[in-house]
């Protein structure tokens, strides 16, 4: 592929991300600063080391089908600059609810689900001195989670993020139990990190609500479901919020805080302040919307990338190379709004793919059983 063709594809891929970013800001879902926080602290870092095909190959194309299938018809299809309002990045300050000192209020944290994300959430909170109550359905799963937490802590020590002495100290801050009620009875914050099954999550939230103290904030790490979907079974919808971590949670600083229709500004501020105090970079999603910020941007990129492959302009490997060695590192450093020109990007809107159906290239992978790395 020659340089001119590569640059043309790169600009279109960036325009797809930019178009959806602007649409989110215009809709009041978040501000420009929130978009760039998500990019620089999570998905942009992924793009800088692996393009969209490499990333989704690791996740699994069957899961991509679920995520993209729900979003492909919802992401922006604006074809001209006149259809959007350019956000003023300089005025983007993030969520500005009532300020609270959250560090002293979330000392005891229950993590429900000790799997891939749950154990990472637990170990990061433990490193920062929180007393963590890790819960799952079997002692085997909990034992395995502690083993993986130890590995994660050693990895942090190996790169100088923590000292060797902090490994064992952090582990002493993690208690395990298969009794859900016991795990949440003293919790200031409960983070549900179970499988992406709404009925399961509702059952967990109903039990948590009946067992946790009335002051507890109840959160879900779901990347799919919004707070009203699981919080509706509780008697404290004002204290229910989404806290969407990125994998691996102890290495990527970004999180998305998703507010439900009843979530109080005090709770959002508590969560935001607490996570900022331990070094996380929260972006507040102010309106319930499918895919939040992160998945919508990733699907916008993937749709344009797959369209480019289907048209024969580039291979998947070439697309990954363009992202990984082109704009990926730039986006990881300064985000989308600090990286691109509105006039340059908006000129490309009319050229972008606007299909509302899943690309054939994805459907072919699913049909052939090519599900990626499992």
What are these regions (language model features)?
Residues 119-120:
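Residues forming the Rossmann-fold NAD(P)(H) cofactor-binding site
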Residues 116, 140-141, 155-217, 225:
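Rossmann-like NAD(P)-binding element
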Residues 145, 208, 227-231:
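Hydrophobic packing residues within well-ordered alpha-helices of enzyme cores
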Residues 1-8, 16, 22-114, 123-130, ...:
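NAD(P)-dependent Rossmann-like dehydrogenase/reductase catalytic/cofactor-binding core
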Residues 112, 177, 193, 220-222, ...:
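Structural motif
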Residues 1-12, 217-287, 291, 295:
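Rossmann-fold dinucleotide-binding core
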Residues 130, 135-162:
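Glycine-rich phosphate-binding loop and adjoining beta1-alpha1-beta2 segment
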């Amino acid at each position: 592929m020659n340089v001119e063709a590569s640059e043309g594809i790169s600009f279109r891929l960036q325009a797809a991300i930019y178009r959806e970013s602007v649409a989110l800001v215009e809709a009041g879902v978040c501000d420009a600063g929130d978009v760039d926080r998500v990019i620089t602290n999570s998905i942009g870092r992924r793009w800088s080391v692996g393009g969209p095909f490499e990333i989704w190959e690791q996740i699994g194309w069957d899961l991509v089908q679920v995520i993209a299938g729900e979003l492909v018809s919802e992401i922006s299809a604006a074809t001209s600059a006149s259809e959007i309002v350019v956000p003023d990045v300089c005025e983007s300050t993030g969520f500005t609810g009532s300020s609270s000192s959250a560090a002293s209020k979330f000392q005891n944290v229950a993590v429900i689900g000790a799997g891939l994300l749950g154990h990472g959430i637990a170990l990061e909170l433990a490193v920062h001195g929180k007393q963590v109550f890790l819960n799952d359905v079997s002692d085997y799963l909990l034992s395995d989670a502690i083993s993986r937490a130890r590995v994660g802590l050693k990895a942090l020590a190996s790169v100088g993020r923590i000292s060797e002495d902090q490994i064992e100290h952090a582990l002493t801050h993690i208690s395990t139990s298969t009794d859900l009620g016991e795990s949440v009875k003293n919790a200031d914050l409960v983070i549900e990190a179970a499988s992406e099954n709404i009925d399961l999550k509702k059952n967990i939230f109903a039990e948590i609500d009946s067992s946790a103290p009335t002051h507890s904030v109840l959160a879900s790490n779901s990347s799919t479901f919004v707070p009203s979907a699981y919080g509706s079974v509780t008697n404290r919808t004002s204290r229910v919020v989404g806290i969407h971590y990125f994998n691996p949670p102890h290495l990527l600083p970004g999180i998305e805080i998703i507010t439900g229709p009843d979530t109080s500004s005090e709770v959002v501020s508590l969560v935001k302040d607490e996570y900022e105090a331990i070094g996380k970079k929260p972006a507040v999603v102010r309106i319930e919307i499918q895919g939040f910020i992160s998945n919508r941007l990733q699907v916008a990129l993937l749709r344009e990338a797959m369209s480019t492959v289907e048209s024969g302009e580039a291979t998947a490997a070439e697309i990954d190379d363009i992202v990984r060695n082109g704009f990926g590192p730039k986006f990881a450093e300064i985000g989308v709004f600090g990286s691109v020109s509105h006039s340059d990007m908006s000129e490309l809107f009319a050229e972008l793919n606007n299909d509302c159906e899943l690309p054939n290239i994805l459907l072919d992978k699913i049909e052939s059983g090519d599900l990626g790395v499992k």
